């Protein structure tokens, strides 16, 4: 079984993933936040690097989902970020805010649409909703360098 936790940055996805994995003995799958070669550049010049960064995240999340699809047949896996948030929240927001050209956005969406033919949706998706002040407090308290530069 594949259980996905969705929510904004700082909403508690990783914390809930840890709690569920520990309580039920499920296998946790965390978003790899340690390395993205575009992240630092992105926060310095968002319009220039948004497409590159979003494609990098899409590639990583797609690889994770392929692995999850194979593993979730034998065990329950709980995941703390989904490919769908990257597409329908972050990338779409970058486009709407003028940080991504229409051409780049359509190229990105065509790539994602091609991937969806072999993806399986999670068996259950849990959405965490939080107020902005709570999100900001959580982001600041964990002190990830790249998040401190967020506009």
What is each PLM-predicted segment?
Residues 8:
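P-loop (Walker A) phosphate-binding loop of NTP-binding proteins
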Residues 1-2:
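Pre-Walker A (Motif I) flank of P-loop NTPase domains
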Residues 22-60:
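Conserved substrate/cofactor phosphate-moiety recognition/catalytic segment
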């Amino acid at each position: 079984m594949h259980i996905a936790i969705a929510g904004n940055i700082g909403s508690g996805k990783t914390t809930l993933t840890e709690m569920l994995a520990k309580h039920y003995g499920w296998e946790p799958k965390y978003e790899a936040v340690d390395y993205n070669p575009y992240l630092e550049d992105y926060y310095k010049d968002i319009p220039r690097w948004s497409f590159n960064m979003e494609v990098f995240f899409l590639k990583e999340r797609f690889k994770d989902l392929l692995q999850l699809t194979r593993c979730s047949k034998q065990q329950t896996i709980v995941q703390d970020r989904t490919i769908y948030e990257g597409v329908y929240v972050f990338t779409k927001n970058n486009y709407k805010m003028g940080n991504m050209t229409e051409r780049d956005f359509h190229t990105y969406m065509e790539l994602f649409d091609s991937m969806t033919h072999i993806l399986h949706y999670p068996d259950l998706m849990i959405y965490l909703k939080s107020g902005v002040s709570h999100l900001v407090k959580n982001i600041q308290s964990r002190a990830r360098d790249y998040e401190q530069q967020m506009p």
